[in-house]
């Protein structure tokens, strides 16, 4: 199974375990697919170019048939403000919630969903640029900056620690009772990282 389909499977697993239910019965995997599309469009449109190579790659990897005019429209509706490069994808937040909040006991993915998704973004972006013979330094830098942003959020919750798996298991099995919301928020806030994302995730933990 390739990493994108693995992440779709993880979306289903997180939903099945009650971590998240999106408004309007939108599936988390569909939300992720949209976010991955926006990510690739963002890389392409930084230099204003979107050609047949990019179109073919998106069709193959995500199943969307996106014309140049559609790509421009996606950019205009979602990416004109400077904040896109620092905006954490919604699905990524829920993956962080599942892992850092220990929402799933005996997680079949060993609490590595968020880490896997960040690696998938990186790999997908690298493959996208490799498939485009006209890739520019600007596009490479944009990909690098976006991946750094994702990694900083993982670090913020300790999800890049080499021993994270054992730490998560220890947290789940230390006693039979779940930590209350205040304890969990205190634990998450004790980690260094990005305040805005912590506020979002901490709010979700109380849901």
Model-derived features with residue positions:
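Pre-Walker A (pre-P-loop) alpha-helix and adjacent loop at the N terminus of AAA/AAA+ ATPase modules
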Residues: 182-207
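Small-residue-enriched hydrophobic alpha-helices in membranes
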Residues: 1-185
């Amino acid at each position: 199974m390739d990493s994108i389909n693995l992440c779709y499977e993880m979306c289903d697993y997180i939903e099945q375990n009650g971590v998240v239910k999106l408004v309007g019965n939108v599936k988390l995997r569909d939300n992720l697919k949209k976010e991955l599309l926006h990510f690739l469009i963002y890389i392409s449109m930084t230099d204003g170019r979107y050609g047949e190579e990019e179109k073919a790659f998106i069709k193959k990897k995500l199943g969307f048939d996106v014309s140049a005019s559609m790509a421009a429209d996606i950019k205009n509706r979602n990416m004109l403000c400077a904040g896109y490069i620092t905006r954490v994808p919604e699905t990524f937040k829920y993956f962080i919630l599942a892992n850092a909040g220990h929402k799933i006991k005996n997680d079949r993915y060993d609490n590595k969903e968020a880490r896997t998704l960040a690696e998938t973004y990186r790999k997908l972006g690298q493959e996208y640029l490799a498939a485009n013979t006209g890739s520019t330094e600007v596009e490479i830098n944009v990909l690098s900056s976006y991946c750094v942003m994702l990694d900083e959020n993982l670090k913020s919750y300790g999800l890049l620690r080499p021993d994270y798996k054992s730490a998560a298991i220890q947290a789940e099995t230390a006693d039979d009772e779940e930590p209350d919301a205040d304890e969990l928020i205190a634990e998450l806030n004790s980690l260094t990282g990005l305040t805005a994302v912590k506020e979002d995730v901490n709010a979700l933990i109380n849901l």
